[in-house]
Amino acid sequence: MSDKRENYLSWDEYFMMNALLISARSKDPHNRVGACIVNSDNKVLSVGYNGLPKGMNDDTFDWASSGEKTGIKKDVKDYYVVHAERNAILNYRGSLDDLKGSTLYVTWFPCTECTKEIIQVGIKKVVYLRMYSKKELVDISKIMLNHAGVEVVCYGIDDITKEEVESVTDDVLSLAKKLSSLGYQAYSFSGGFY
């Protein structure tokens, strides 16, 4: 009989928890989305969360539809926020050919624009936690993924609420903040703390 611990995370649990943890970096007060791209050897290739493009100030633009800061009134954040899936693809520093055959773990089902990029780079499996709220766009994404031969897997249950997902993310964020306040720091292998 083995003495190994029995209640460890499965690979799917591990990578989805990675996506949830990554989503905690998003400053969007309404939709925190995280993505994690993994190769067939269970190695994380890249991660991303929904946020502004690099170099843009989070305080300069509206995170709501008010248009107070930009003068644009309808779904203003949709014009400038980079989605988690796209950020994960853009953050990858190797050849995009390396993404062929990989798996994407994402906290929300991909929109149509992200779906196009997922297909284009050759990701072959999408594991999502929560369904995107716009049914028509979900249906279009599903059709595209199906036609491209991308396997789609719902991790858990389709009717998990946004609040339930964000509650887990908040718990993880709370733990990270608590560890930080206790003096825990991340150690850099290149020497020193960051």
Question: Where in the sequence are the language-model features?
Answer:
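Zinc-dependent deaminase catalytic domain
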Residues: 1-194
